[in-house]
A protein has these predicted regions:
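N-terminal pre-domains immediately preceding structured catalytic cores
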Residues: 2-112, 117-147
Length: 147
């Protein structure tokens, strides 16, 4: 049953892309033209289901899916040269709304979602439009409140 539901959700998402009504086409355009700090958030598209977060390092974008349906896209800032954001599949290990870095002089890491125990997390931070972090994935403050 799980495979059937997954295929159905995936096919539904693909179907929307192929049929692309004007409103959906506008959303796709908006995703490509987001400026640093901008995001879209539409939780009503899929009110329940497992959540997956995909970080595109080349595009400096974070995509949030719930129940196999994309509900949000945001700009981000990943690791700068020498501090690259690791790639792979991670589980959120810890959440802390008011976290402070133990590595970088108590630097604030609002709405922190820890990915590794050696300091990699999703959190709110500065978004210059290019990779600039020490390996974390920086998000807009308001977007980080939803993740």
């Amino acid at each position: 049953m799980t495979d059937h539901l997954s295929r159905r959700h995936f096919a539904g998402a693909i179907g929307l892309g192929l049929l692309a009504p004007a409103a959906f086409a506008q959303t796709l355009k908006d995703i490509r033209t987001l400026k640093p700090g901008e995001f879209t958030w539409h939780p009503e598209r899929s009110p329940a289901g497992p959540v997956a977060i995909i970080v595109s390092i080349p595009d400096q974008r974070v995509h949030v899916y719930r129940g196999g349906i994309r509900i949000g896209v945001s700009t981000c800032s990943t690791g700068k040269p020498g501090h690259e954001t690791p790639t792979g599949v991670f589980t959120i290990l810890q959440k802390d709304k008011d976290h402070k870095s133990s590595t970088y002089n108590n630097a604030p890491m609002p709405n922190m979602n820890r990915l590794t125990w050696d300091g990699i997390a999703l959190h709110a931070g500065k978004l210059p439009g290019y990779p600039a972090s020490h390996g974390c994935v920086r998000l807009p403050m308001r977007f980080s409140e939803h993740v």
